[in-house]
Amino acid sequence: ATGVARRRRAACRPLPSQGKVLTVDIPNAKSNFTARKAMIYLPPAALSDRPPALPVMELLAGQPGSPSRLIDAGNIAATMNAYAAKHDGLAPIVLVPDQNGEATHNSLCADTTQGNAETYLTTDVVNWAKKMLPVAKSARMWAMGGFSQGGTCTTQLVPRHPEIYGAMLPVDGELKPTNGSVGKMVQEYFAGDRKAYDGNRVPVNAIASSGTSEQALFTGAGERDKESISNMRTIADAARKAGMEVTELIVPGAGHDWHAVQAVWRPGLDWFGERTGLGEMTKSLKEYPQVEVLQ
């Protein structure tokens, strides 16, 4: 175990045997964004009498989707509990906020005329977690991840906020925020301002403009989802140019689906745990049976 992990383990006994999934209301004090209830996973260490400051994974569902869909289809509780069982109760705290407001709406994860989703996700959610939960404060200890539209949000927002997030774990994401044609989005979300859309809302532009070499990209796509594979390669190239550590995975037999998400996030959790000092990876990425490593 790393020194950080040893200190955390010593600080947080006694421990329950498993973590908990809770449904919470996260205030929208800065954004005024109308969000559905969020869900969170608290590992055993977070439930102890003296919880340590733990890493955070802020995870976003696709659209249509919901926080409960991500928790269930992503197999979050079982995956996190299995990790915690191998690390003396230590695992990241998982935040699953609602980025869209309703299942049929796409917020573009941006501050637009249809709501301030970016401010909600990167300010309201983050401030609430830092106030209410035993979370670490430094950017290296925070990751964002997501599936499909949630993956797109990840590659938009993480490079725009290097002071908050140090890692991104998108699966089957898009090249850009998408809800109809670009022209339609520019009119309906940005009051006709094309530069507001193209600027830092498009992931490769956000990465080039404000991504840093302190950040890292751990990404994947289903083998049958050719468009997402192409998107992944393009965004990974941009991340490398920004000096980021980049890992690309393919999930054999999977498409644009939750099988891909689960397969990518299993090694992704081990990778993030090592990155944040919870424990070292015990095998190489090539030894995970459900994924193939591109980079």
Please describe what each predicted stretch is.
Residues A1-Q295:
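Non-catalytic cap/lid and distal C-terminal segments of serine-dependent acyl enzymes
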